[in-house]
UniProtKB/Swiss-Prot annotation:
GO BP of this protein: symbiont-mediated suppression of host NF-kappaB cascade
Name of the protein in question: I-Kappa-B like protein H1
Role noted for this protein: Suppresses the host immune response through NF-kappa-B inactivation. Possesses ankyrin repeat domains required for NF-kappa-B binding but lacks the regulatory regions required for dissociation from NF-kappa-B and degradation. Therefore, prevents host NF-kappa-B release and subsequent activation.
SUPFAM superfamilies in UniProt: Ankyrin repeat
Length: 192
């Protein structure tokens, strides 16, 4: 039932966006956003749709990641012509970015979803606001081995980022006595 509700909400937003594009393409206006960027009106409407917050503080990308929907992420990626790290790195009211939501869900499509949001400008080493966990820390906690292995090979990953408790992902794996996760980090350090 919840997925149906989310699906309906996305279509409502999409239809509002389509209606606004007609007006925006006939009246191209330049203006400054809150972040100091200059947008055309049609870009601003898309930006507004993707960055609008729901009741839990999440954006379009948070909702798409919570729904484990690659289709919704691809749809947004198709509308964007450049990376938008400001939207993708917004934290919800629990302090989570969309990368943290993906790392929390231990589904088969999590690698593909992470790849999409990273291409759109998400921070691979971003720390969530409560405990300072990176997506890699969360993978260790959730025993998401496939995503942890993929993240360890991703460009720009920093496996030595410490959470607020001064623990790296490897430290967490040792603390949890998770040999499989420790092996992933040890193999990565051999390649470096």
């Amino acid at each position: 039932m919840m997925r149906y509700y989310i699906y309906v909400q996305y279509w409502k937003r999409f239809l509002r966006l389509v209606r606004s594009f007609h007006w925006a393409t006939s009246n191209v206006l330049l203006f400054k956003s809150d972040f100091g960027d200059t947008f055309k009106m049609r870009d601003y409407n898309l930006y507004e749709m993707l960055s609008a917050r729901n009741g839990s503080g999440g954006t379009y990308f948070h909702e798409a990641c919570q729904a484990n929907s690659i289709a919704l992420l691809w749809r947004a990626a198709g509308m964007l012509d450049e990376s938008h790290p400001r939207i993708l790195n917004i934290r919800d009211y629990k302090g989570a970015q969309c990368t943290h939501i993906i790392a929390t869900s231990n589904v088969s499509c999590s690698i593909d979803m992470m790849n999409i949001v990273l291409q759109l400008g998400a921070d691979i080493n971003g720390q969530e606001g409560l405990a300072g966990l990176t997506p890699l820390h969360i993978c260790v906690n959730k025993k998401n081995y496939a995503l942890a292995e993929w993240l360890c090979q991703a460009p720009g990953i920093d496996v030595k980022v410490e959470n607020f408790g001064k623990e790296t992902p490897y430290d967490l794996a040792c603390k949890m006595e998770d040999r499989k996760m420790m092996k992933i980090f040890e193999e990565r350090s051999k390649k470096m």
